[in-house]
């Protein structure tokens, strides 16, 4: 009998406190708890990791060498474990070739559809291009009336310049007698004179035949000769009427040809189909004059050209060469660049149009004579960017460049041949430019021929089912050509979820990380139904989630806590949703039952009375909207998924402010004009990206408190006696660190086909510093001991050090008191990383004119963490600053001073302002999806508050 429970015994991974529990199989199980409580450690680092390890262990040593090893999690035993698949929030891919269509495999099926059912059309004449075999051509000719006089010709030259003397001589040598030149029959034995610079059409007369049944073989042979001579083309002339035949896919009028249709012709990753200019990327990188010359008021000698700024009037060879170019064309180095003529700018950017003789003196005093073209600065940077192998040089050259739409394909990635093929009224790229919902509609309505329908039946079924799965997980607004790297974590996760649904696996354990992220409440029910469908196929689901609706729809809930970090790691509750509502121990249960809640503020802030305004915003799907962001308030930008929130805030507003503050390389989205940006003197974006990419980065180094701690240690009696400065207490530089492990505390041992093994350094025993440094102590603790402390413990140790105490207090204020000061940044969750950034910003002096931008800050946060986050955001606003938040969480939305709600739907049907105002005003707007859900929340919160007061 199959085991109906997943049994975990003795789980001790990260902060888990030797926990044991049983959870049902083939059910939807939600794991919840405060941020940092250990739910991810249990779900991903223990259960999924063990499932993955068992799979890898079952493979041969040779296969394991390529897969890499999976370390055994710190758990005594797991029973009843199925093959495990993880669907997390990591962005799908930053590869510019990866799109929604390729990730979901829809594009693979589309390529097959267009290869088998597509019809090429001439891009110039808009007529279908068809290829015939010779028997079809003969049959068409034989359908003419008997006695019809025919001339078979081979079109060898089409619309080309030249005299073609050599071609005429060869044709005569091969036995041909007549040619038709520009519509006029001529004898090859005559001296045919053609204008060299005029375009000509030349056809070779192969045969003149009277159509009759006995001539069928002769017609076949003549057509075959013509096809061989003219690369698959033949003309049959009947009086004044002529018919162009082609064994290729070629236009009968202009000869535009298409290779044999096959799936790789429609791949922008294959040379056959990719645009030759951009190689299938859809964009090219070129030097932007505004980045090269940011201030055109300056002269070249004053450093107007950023590339030469630091080498003006030096012996640098690059400057000598450039100065020679300027002298050769008498271009002044001392007039403002804006006064230079268009021709002079052409010389500066693209170089000389003739060779120049000049001499170069090297730094060693040697003189070299040269006579050559001198390259322009723009052309030189673009050439070097491609040629250099140095990452540093590449970054330097790239700082002058921008991405621009490919001039050849117009951003469509494919070459003209691939784009000429249509199914119905669209080519393959036009299909991918549609949103998921529009693509579904088009597939249903497009009429195919009987043959096409039969061929395409299974392919269309596969495409349609994948589109439906995307719609079911709330992604119907996405276009199939959307770059995977531009997706949010939640969108990327739901795409992988849709792909898994499409595979229809059963008997699998799926581990998901907050699939509801980025999803509006309206779409949540569809996602929950999708998860239930996966369960009903015979799969087990473990969902790490904070969303109340998802929890209440689960079959089972595991609550990890009671607190975070060292205060968590225990199973607080393990049972059904009905039971958790009555639990006295579970903080989650108290919020779900309404015993705990986040209160609505008593009153909304008035703000400063000033606003930043964008007029005529039309980037992506935004419909030429005018938006006011009131300053000195907590502003929430809301709307269903894909309605344009991130485009408005991140692409348009934020970049407009950054540009106004003097940031370079910033290109805001489309808008007509902007007002009120002078009321903002600083902009801070606080996202959930890691605070550091290496294990050496940690909360103490990021917030700057470690500098202060090192200063304290440098002032201890022992350190002063030995002459140590604060650099001695850094694990990143020589001096105080252990040189055996370079301050890492561990050494990596490569095991070839086994996973790398990390062993504590045998010299410092994992303490990162050398013995002399560790002998310096503060209140009995050395520098290693401090890094191993939690923020709360550090607060106690440094209670009499105001500078350190204040910085550590801000970390506690944002709910991170449980973090170790030296905890590697790579181990922090997105929510934790964001709060470390918040704490770092809170330490800085408020200007009162700062704008903070946060994109879905509640990701990874329990309702209790959200309560703390709201308090922090309100503290920032109370100092006169502005906080703009993109969010779906109703607890945050109801605490806003001002809401901008976009919609009404996602994608093409979004991009309009549906409602603006206080939460109470938006809640009364019947057209706002957010308002409808907000109205229920405000009523529910008010009712609970009144009940408690009674």
Placement of each model-derived feature along the sequence:
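Conserved phosphate-binding elements of NTP-dependent enzyme cores
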Residues: 1-950
């Amino acid at each position: 009998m199959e085991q109906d429970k997943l049994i975990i015994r003795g789980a001790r991974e990260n902060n888990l406190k030797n926990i044991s529990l049983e959870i049902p199989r083939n059910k939807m199980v939600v794991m919840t708890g405060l941020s940092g409580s250990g739910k991810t450690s249990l779900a991903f680092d223990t259960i999924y990791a063990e499932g993955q390890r068992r799979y890898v262990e079952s493979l041969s040593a040779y296969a394991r060498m390529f897969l890499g090893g999976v370390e055994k999690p710190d758990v005594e035993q797991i029973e009843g474990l199925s093959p495990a698949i993880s669907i997390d929030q990591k962005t799908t891919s930053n590869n510019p070739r990866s799109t929604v269509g390729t990730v979901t495999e829809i594009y693979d099926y589309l390529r097959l559809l267009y290869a088998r059912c597509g019809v090429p059309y001439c891009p110039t004449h808009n007529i279908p291009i068809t290829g015939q075999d010779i028997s079809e051509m003969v049959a068409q000719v034989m359908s003419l009336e008997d006695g019809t006089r025919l001339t078979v010709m081979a079109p060898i030259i089409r619309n080309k310049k030249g005299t073609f003397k050599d071609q005429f001589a060869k044709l005569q040598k091969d036995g041909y007698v007549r040619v038709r030149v520009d519509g006029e029959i001529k004898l090859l034995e005559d001296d045919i004179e053609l204008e060299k610079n005029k375009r000509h059409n030349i056809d070779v007369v192969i045969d003149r035949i009277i159509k009759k049944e006995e001539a069928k073989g002769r017609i076949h042979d003549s057509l075959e000769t013509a096809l061989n001579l003219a690369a698959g083309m033949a003309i049959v002339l009947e009086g004044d009427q002529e018919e162009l035949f082609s064994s290729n896919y070629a236009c009968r009028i202009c000869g535009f040809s298409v290779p044999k249709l096959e799936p790789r012709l429609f791949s922008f990753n294959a040379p056959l189909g990719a645009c030759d200019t951009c190689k299938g990327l859809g964009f090219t990188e070129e030097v932007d004059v505004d980045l090269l010359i940011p201030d055109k008021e300056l002269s070249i000698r004053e450093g107007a050209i950023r590339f030469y700024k630091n080498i003006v009037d030096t012996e640098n060879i690059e400057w000598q060469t450039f100065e020679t170019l300027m002298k050769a064309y008498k271009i002044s180095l001392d007039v403002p660049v804006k006064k230079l003529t268009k021709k002079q700018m052409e010389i500066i950017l693209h170089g000389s149009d003739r060779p120049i003789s000049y001499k170069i003196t090297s730094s060693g005093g040697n003189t070299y004579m040269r006579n050559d073209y001198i390259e322009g600065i723009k052309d030189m940077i673009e050439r070097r960017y491609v040629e250099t192998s140095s990452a540093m040089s590449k970054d330097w050259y790239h700082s002058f460049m921008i991405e621009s739409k490919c001039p050849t394909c117009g951003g469509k990635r494919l070459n003209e041949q691939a784009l000429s093929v249509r199914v119905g009224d669209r080519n393959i790229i036009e299909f991918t430019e549609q949103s998921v919902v529009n693509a579904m509609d088009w597939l249903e309505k497009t009429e195919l021929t009987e043959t096409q329908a039969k061929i395409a039946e299974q392919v269309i079924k596969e495409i349609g089912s994948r589109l439906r799965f995307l719609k079911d997980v709330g992604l119907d607004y996405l276009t199939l050509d959307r770059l995977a790297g531009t997706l949010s974590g939640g969108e990327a996760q739901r795409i992988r979820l849709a792909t898994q649904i499409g595979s229809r696996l059963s008997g699998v354990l799926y581990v998901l990380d907050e699939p509801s992220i980025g999803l509006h409440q309206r779409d949540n029910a569809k996602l929950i139904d999708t998860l239930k469908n996966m369960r009903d196929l015979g799969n087990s689901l473990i969902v790490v989630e904070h969303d109340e609706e998802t929890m209440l729809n689960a079959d089972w809930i595991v609550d990890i806590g009671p607190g975070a970090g060292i205060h968590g790691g225990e199973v607080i509750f393990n049972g059904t949703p009905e039971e958790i509502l009555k639990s006295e121990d579970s903080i989650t249960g108290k919020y779900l039952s309404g015993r705990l809640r986040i209160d609505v503020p008593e009153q909304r802030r008035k703000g400063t009375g000033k606003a930043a305004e964008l007029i005529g915003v039309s980037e992506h799907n935004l419909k030429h909207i005018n938006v006011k962001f009131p300053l000195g308030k907590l502003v929430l930008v809301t709307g269903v998924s894909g309605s344009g929130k991130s485009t408005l805030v991140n692409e348009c507003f934020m970049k407009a402010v950054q540009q106004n503050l003097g940031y370079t390389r910033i290109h805001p989205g489309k808008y007509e004009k902007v007002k009120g940006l002078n009321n903002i003197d600083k902009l801070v974006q606080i996202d959930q990206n890691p605070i550091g990419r290496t294990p050496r980065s940690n909360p103490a180094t990021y917030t700057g408190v470690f500098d202060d701690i090192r200063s304290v240690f440098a002032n201890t009696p022992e350190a002063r006696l030995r002459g140590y400065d604060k650099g001695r207490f850094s694990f990143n530089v020589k001096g105080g660190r252990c040189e055996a492990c370079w301050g890492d505390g561990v050494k990596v041992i490569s095991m070839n086909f086994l996973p790398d093994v990390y062993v504590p350094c045998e010299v410092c025993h994992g303490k990162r510093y050398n013995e002399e440094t560790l002998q310096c102590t503060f209140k009995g603790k050395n520098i290693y001991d401090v890094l191993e402390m939690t923020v709360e413990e550090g607060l106690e140790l440094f209670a009499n050090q105001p500078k350190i105490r204040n910085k550590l207090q801000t970390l506690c204020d944002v709910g991170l008191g449980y973090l170790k000061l030296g905890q590697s940044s790579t181990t922090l969750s997105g929510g934790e990383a964001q709060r470390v950034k918040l704490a770092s910003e809170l330490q800085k002096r408020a200007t009162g004119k700062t704008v903070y931008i946060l994109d879905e800050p509640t990701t990874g946060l329990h309702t209790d963490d959200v309560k703390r986050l709201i308090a922090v955001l309100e503290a920032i606003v109370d100092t006169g600053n502005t906080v703009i938040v993109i969010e779906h969480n109703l607890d945050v939305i109801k605490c806003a001073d001002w809401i901008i709600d976009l919609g009404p739907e996602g994608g093409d049907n979004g991009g309009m302002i549906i409602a603006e105002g206080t939460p109470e005003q938006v809640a009364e707007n019947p057209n706002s999806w957010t308002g409808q859900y907000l109205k229920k929340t405000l009523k529910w919160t008010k009712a609970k508050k009144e009940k408690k007061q009674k």
